[in-house]
């Protein structure tokens, strides 16, 4: 839509985060986004599970990343461009976050 902008990033996870049944104590990864208009796609699928949904910010919870590289697309409103903040957090396993890698170009096409 008019003036909306898209942030595309690739996130590498050393292990799959999409199957709680296999591993009950799996890292739970959240994505905090500060923006009034926002939408998240993970590997081209809209993702809507949230633990917090405020007027100015949202926390997407338990991101179902696959092992290896994952494509994340964050769509933001035009007015959010200068005020956007985003970061990952892992509430239950502090040592997991440093294992993630992020890139702004697809590492698998290089």
Where are these regions (language model features)?
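Solvent-exposed loop and beta-edge segments used for protein-protein assembly and interaction
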Residues: 1-3, 21-25, 32, 55, ...
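Extended carbohydrate-recognition surfaces in non-catalytic/accessory domains of CAZymes
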Residues: 1-25, 110
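Short beta-strand/loop motifs in extracellular/secreted proteins, especially
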Residues: 3-5, 27-29, 36-40, 82-84, ...
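Short beta-strand segments enriched in hydrophobic/aromatic residues
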Residues: 13, 35, 76-78
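Aromatic-lined ligand-binding clefts that engage carbohydrates, nucleic acids, or primary amines
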Residues: 17-41, 72
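Solvent-exposed beta-strand/loop surfaces of large extracellular or lumenal domains
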Residues: 35, 39-61
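An acidic-aromatic loop/edge-strand motif
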Residues: 61-110
